[in-house]
Swiss-Prot record:
Pfam families: RecX_HTH1, RecX_HTH2, RecX_HTH3. It is found in: Cytoplasm. GO terms for cellular component: cytoplasm. Modulates RecA activity. GO terms for biological process: regulation of DNA repair. NCBIfam families: PRK00117.2-1. InterPro entries: RecX_HTH_1st, RecX_HTH_2nd, RecX_HTH_3rd, Regulatory_RecX, WH-like_DNA-bd_sf. This is Regulatory protein RecX. It comes from the Bacteria.
Length: 162
């Protein structure tokens, strides 16, 4: 019997991904800010110059857009029960300037007070907070979630006519 060489394994051959491929892999999952995308590329071993060039290229080609990212964050967080102060702070951590943040918050089509009331209804039931300790708890919850004072007062007042 002849000794035969083993057949080559049938498996995928993984080629090292280029910085652009890695960045696109991140962007197809969800939107990223320029700062966040650059940080993630650096964490994956991409050289700083190559990472910055990749982010610039993808921004120029429309794959990455801070305005689109900010609008998505506003939509997502507002739908999860967070207020404008929390969202503004979160967008600031992503390296967006105050003008971009203000523009993104302006795209929100809902009413912050109504969002606050919805959150209170989910936590305290349809009748809302009934006594002073519950109203304080509700106000504390809304403050932690980033709602402003006017929205907190309006949401914890809970007049049935509103």
């Amino acid at each position: 019997m002849d000794e035969q060489e083993p057949a080559p394994k049938r498996g995928r051959r993984f080629k090292e991904q280029t910085p652009v491929q890695r960045a696109l892999g991140l962007l197809v999952r969800r939107e990223h800010s320029r700062k966040e995308l650059n940080r993630k590329l650096l964490a994956r071993g991409i050289e700083p110059d190559a990472a910055q060039a990749t982010v610039d290229r993808l921004t120029d080609e429309g794959w990455q857009d801070d305005t689109r990212f900010a609008a998505a964050v506003v939509r997502n967080r507002a739908g999860s029960g967070y207020g404008p102060l929390h969202i503004r702070a979160e967008l600031g951590t992503h390296g967006l300037d105050s003008e971009a943040i203000s523009a993104a918050l302006a795209t929100f089509e809902g009413d912050w007070t109504e969002n606050a009331r919805d959150l209170i209804r989910r936590r305290f039931g349809e009748q809302g907070p009934t006594d002073l300790p519950q109203r304080r708890k509700a106000a504390d919850l809304l403050a932690r979630r980033g709602f402003d004072g006017n929205s907190i007062r309006a949401a914890t007042r809970f007049d049935l006519e509103d």
